[in-house]
Structures are given as structure tokens and as C-alpha cells.
């Protein structure tokens, strides 16, 4: 989410060599970035005056967004965006973990997720900084089945 869509488009295209697609009207002006024709990430404008800072969001894959939302809510997470279809691309939702970190959920449709890995400009690592380590570890183990 950004307060300067045009500036963000120019920045990421120049720094990472991405190409910005034209904003998709049916998705509220959402901009997809591609690398060599493969979708990498997206960008949307924040609401003016919302006080929300510019921020990146990470989406974790799930086979069933509704089931994962229920598990998150049961294990001290908060649901902020209920599962919703994003055209035929997939289904998204958004939660915060017990420490307050935001995390998106992505149930793939036509868009499976990252198509480019291990190259400059491609995602390579995500790291959680949390106020409540034990609660966060328990949440991700239980909700997503992760080992730590």
C-alpha cells in the first residue's frame, strides 16, 4: 500500500527492473508488477487521510482461505479482511497474528504465487519481528503447520 502510486511504480521499475502494468479498474486501480512477463507483486493506493503508513504485505499460500481464517481467529489472530475472490486469480484475506503483525492469505486460482525466484529483483526472504515471540511461534505452527 502506498501514498504515491506513481512514485512507487517508477521506483520499483528502476531499482528492480520490474514492469508496471496499467492499473486494473475492476480491482480498484491495483497495479501488478511483472519481471520478464511473470507477475511478481502488486501495489495499491492507500486512502488519503487514513493515517496508514506505506507498507509491504506478505501473503501466505493456503489451500482453503476460509479454513485458515477460522484457525487464525481460534488461535488469537484477528481477521481484518474476510475471504474474497480476486477475479479468477484466487481468493485473498488478511489477518494479524497475536503480536499484531499483518499477514495476507492467498488461496491460488489462476495466479499461483511467485513465478520468479533466485534472481535479482525476486523475493528471497521474509522475516517476522514480533512483540510476542512465543505467541507468534505457536500461531504459525498451529495455523500454517510450520516447524520452528
Language-model-detected regions and their locations in the chain:
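Short glycine-rich, polar/acidic loop-and-turn segments at beta strand-coil junctions
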Residues: 22-24, 37, 44-47, 64
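Short, low-complexity, polar/charged sequence segments that are solvent-exposed and flexible
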Residues: 38-41, 60-63, 79, 122-126, ...
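DNA polymerase sliding clamps and clamp-related checkpoint/processivity subunits
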Residues: 42-49, 58, 80-81, 85, ...
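Glycine-rich acetyl-CoA-binding "A-motif" of GNAT/NAT acetyltransferases
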Residues: 39, 54, 102
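Vicinal oxygen chelate
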Residues: 1-3, 31-33, 47-71, 73-128, 148, ...
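Core segments of cupin and vicinal oxygen chelate
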Residues: 1-39, 74, 82-90, 97, ...
Amino acid at each position: 500500500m502506498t501514498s504515491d502510486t506513481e512514485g512507487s511504480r517508477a521506483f520499483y521499475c528502476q531499482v528492480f527492473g520490474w514492469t508496471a502494468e496499467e492499473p486494473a479498474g475492476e480491482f480498484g486501480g491495483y497495479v501488478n508488477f511483472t519481471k520478464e512477463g511473470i507477475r511478481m507483486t502488486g501495489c495499491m493506493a492507500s486512502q488519503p487521510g487514513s493515517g496508514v503508513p506505506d507498507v509491504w504485505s506478505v501473503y501466505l499460500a493456503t489451500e482453503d482461505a476460509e479454513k485458515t481464517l477460522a484457525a487464525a481467529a481460534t488461535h488469537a489472530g484477528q481477521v481484518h479482511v474476510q475471504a474474497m475472490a480476486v477475479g479468477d486469480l484466487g481468493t485473498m484475506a488478511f489477518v494479524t497474528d497475536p503480536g499484531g503483525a499483518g499477514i495476507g492469505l492467498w488461496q491460488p486460482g489462476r495466479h499461483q504465487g511467485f513465478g520468479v525466484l533466485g534472481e535479482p529483483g525476486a523475493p528471497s526472504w521474509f522475516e517476522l519481528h514480533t512483540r510476542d515471540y512465543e505467541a507468534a511461534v505457536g500461531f504459525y505452527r498451529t495455523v500454517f503447520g510450520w516447524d520452528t
